């Protein structure tokens, strides 16, 4: 069975084609700048070589169509015909409380995603464009939606509700939803496979730390809490997002800066976090380099960043009555040893003991805690696309 996984943003499409017989990636790439000048596709060829192809793409339908043409291209394609694609799986950022698991797409699913656009206007609108483009080009191929927040749907109400009048939750569905759920689900399952443990007996804290970052508490295979909230702005400090901030600080700044609500949201999402503190970059690699060269604000940002992750680890250990495994994943979590070490330092009282040599690892599955550490700390590279492909295959087989 061959499954195409799509992640459609407002002006981009990331794709991977899987052969589910052995979970191998047959093709991968990304379309950028849809609807803008100088649109292009970055393709990873079967031999591993990367190629950039310029192509005019006024809308998502043309973007999807061009992806299809690349997949079947006689020279660089991975398949001979689109008939070889058995299904298409989509990443959907916001499923609200309408979708608690992955679903096969029909009209009601489309309508549901559209109804949630006010919770994730940029993301969900892009996802819908991708869904509809595939439907126009391959109407007979089943499509599946895998929701970013579905894994977090097992949170108890006392964890996901905000302390505001209850009728606002009932009327507007204002609550903690969480994000990166497909990644948290993948690494929590994969780490137990890797360690040979039963997930139903483990208390796991998963740290998805990339430019966007979130921490989740996974108790006996189910998410019981997560750091992101109604939107991906809440929680730990991120590349350009503030993370948790006193709401009164927001209204105070709106008054001082003369910003409207949407302008303030953009400010907290795009000009804050590590970028806001350093004034240099949202890229943690650049911040580590700047700190090493003596930049004091870069050093401050690193301390703030790790400190906030550490606080969430401690909080979630308390929420679960202890912790057995801590997992690091995503761009920063998989590759930056300093962030991992600083975030775990001071957690010896929980039973965390790091192995500094093992912690040198980058981007591969590894145990990075000491042999005598009561808590096992691991790096597990995430694979959200494979999780989406597996969900898609499972739903088709269960039909």
Tell me what each language-model feature is.
Residues 9, 90-93, 209, 323, ...:
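Glycine-rich beta-strand-to-loop/alpha-helix junction loops that act as flexible
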Residues 1-96:
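N-terminal glycine/serine-rich phosphate-binding loop of ATP-dependent small-molecule kinases
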Residues 71, 75-123, 144, 151-159:
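Short beta-strand-loop/turn "lid" adjacent to the catalytic site in phosphate-handling enzymes
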Residues 90, 121-125, 142-147, 153, ...:
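General beta-strand structural signal in soluble alpha/beta enzymes
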Residues 70-85, 191-198, 313-324:
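Phosphate/pyrophosphate-binding loops at sites that engage ATP/ADP/AMP, CoA/4′-phosphopantetheine
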Residues 337, 341-384:
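Conserved phosphate-binding/catalytic loops in two-lobed NTP-binding clefts
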Residues 266, 273-277, 284-319:
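Adenine-nucleotide phosphate-binding core of ATP-dependent small-molecule kinases
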Residues 151-255:
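Glycine-rich phosphate-binding loop of actin/hexokinase-like ATP-binding domains
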């Amino acid at each position: 069975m061959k499954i195409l996984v799509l992640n459609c943003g407002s002006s981009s499409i990331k794709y991977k084609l899987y052969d589910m017989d052995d979970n191998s990636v047959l093709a991968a790439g990304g379309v950028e700048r849809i609807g803008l000048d100088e649109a292009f596709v970055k393709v990873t060829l079967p031999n591993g070589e990367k190629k950039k192809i310029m192509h005019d793409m006024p809308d998502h339908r043309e973007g999807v169509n061009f992806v299809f043409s690349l997949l079947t291209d006689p020279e660089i394609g991975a398949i001979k015909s689109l008939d070889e694609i058995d299904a298409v799986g989509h990443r959907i950022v916001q499923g609200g409380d309408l979708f608690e698991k992955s679903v096969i797409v029909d009209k009601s699913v489309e309508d549901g995603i559209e109804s949630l656009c006010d919770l994730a206007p940029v993301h969900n609108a892009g996802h819908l464009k991708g869904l509809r483009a595939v439907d126009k080009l391959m109407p007979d191929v089943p499509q599946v939606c895998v929701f970013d927040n579905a894994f977090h749907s097992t949170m108890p109400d006392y964890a996901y509700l905000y302390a505001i009048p209850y009728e606002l939750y009932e009327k507007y569905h204002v609550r903690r939803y969480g994000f990166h759920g497909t990644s948290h689900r993948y690494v929590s399952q994969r780490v137990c496979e890797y360690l040979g443990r039963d997930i139903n007996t483990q208390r796991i804290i998963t740290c998805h730390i990339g430019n966007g970052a979130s921490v989740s508490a996974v108790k006996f295979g189910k998410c019981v809490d997560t750091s992101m909230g109604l939107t991906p702005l809440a929680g730990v400090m991120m590349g350009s997002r503030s993370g948790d901030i006193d709401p009164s600080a927001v209204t105070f700044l709106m008054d001082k800066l003369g910003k409207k609500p949407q302008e303030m949201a953009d400010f907290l999402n795009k000009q804050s976090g590590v970028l806001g503190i350093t004034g240099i970059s949202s890229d943690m690699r650049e911040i580590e380099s700047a700190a090493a060269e003596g930049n004091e604000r870069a050093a401050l940002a690193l301390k703030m960043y790790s400190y906030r992750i550490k606080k969430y680890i401690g909080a979630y250990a308390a929420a679960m009555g202890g912790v057995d495994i801590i997992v690091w994943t995503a761009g920063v979590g998989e590759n930056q040893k300093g962030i991992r070490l600083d975030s775990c330092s001071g957690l010896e009282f929980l039973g965390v003991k790091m192995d500094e040599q093992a912690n040198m690892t980058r981007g591969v599955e590894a145990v990075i805690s000491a042999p005598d550490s009561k808590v096992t700390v691991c790096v597990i590279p995430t694979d959200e696309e494979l999780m989406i492909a597996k969900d898609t295959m499972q739903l088709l087989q269960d039909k």
